[in-house]
């Protein structure tokens, strides 16, 4: 059964992101730029002026919303000057850059997100109901929807890696972090 290994992999990935962020969030960057300032600098470096940066509640709830042209940074990232926060903010700005330059894979990903979100939310419900009712068809549909959500994550890995590459290149080009601090900024890669 592929469901349990896929769930374990997802859990381990989330734990890795959280522990990596925790480790590097305690290390203040020497230049003192916050996550919000880093995102703004990356956008400016690419000539992007129509994207807003907002604070959102939560922890590691950071994302770029292409529908409203807003980078939303969590409390742990927005005002923090750690290399991890700068890296996460730059990664999200990297997604805004992808849209600005017309990066094809991000457009495909955006088209698939609503469908995969619905499937992901329904999958576990259908699996549980299928198990409770001994219904193979419901269970099977739930597993199929979950597998589709996992496959979607795999398909979007190139988009995430590209955003991280853009983020690190921008951080190097804008000198927001010292060279030895870039390792902590690569949380965006773990964020994948």
Name what the model sees in each region.
Residues 1-20, 130, 136-143, 149-153, ...:
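Hydrophobic alpha-helical transmembrane segments of small proteolipidic membrane proteins, enriched
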Residues 113-136:
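Post-HExxH zinc-binding segment in Zn-dependent metallohydrolases
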Residues 15-119, 151-189:
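Polar-ligand-bearing catalytic/cofactor-coordination segments
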């Amino acid at each position: 059964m592929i469901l349990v290994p896929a769930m374990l992999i997802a859990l381990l990935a989330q734990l890795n992101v959280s522990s990596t962020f925790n480790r590097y969030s305690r290390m203040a960057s020497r230049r003192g730029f916050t996550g919000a300032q880093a995102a703004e600098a990356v956008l400016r470096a690419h000539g992007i002026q129509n994207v807003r940066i907002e604070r959102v509640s939560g922890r590691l709830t950071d994302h770029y919303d292409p529908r409203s042209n807003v980078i939303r940074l969590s409390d742990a990232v927005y005002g923090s000057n750690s290399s991890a926060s700068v890296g996460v903010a730059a990664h999200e700005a990297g997604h805004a850059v992808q849209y600005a330059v017309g990066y094809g894979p991000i457009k495909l990903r955006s088209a698939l997100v609503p469908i995969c979100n619905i499937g992901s939310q329904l999958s576990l419900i259908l699996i549980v109901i299928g198990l409770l009712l001994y219904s193979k068809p419901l269970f099977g549909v739930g597993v199929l929807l979950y597998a589709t959500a996992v496959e979607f994550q795999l398909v979007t890995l190139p988009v995430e890696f590209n955003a991280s590459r853009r983020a690190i290149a921008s951080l190097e080009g804008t000198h927001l972090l010292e060279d030895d601090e870039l390792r902590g900024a690569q949380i965006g890669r773990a964020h994948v």
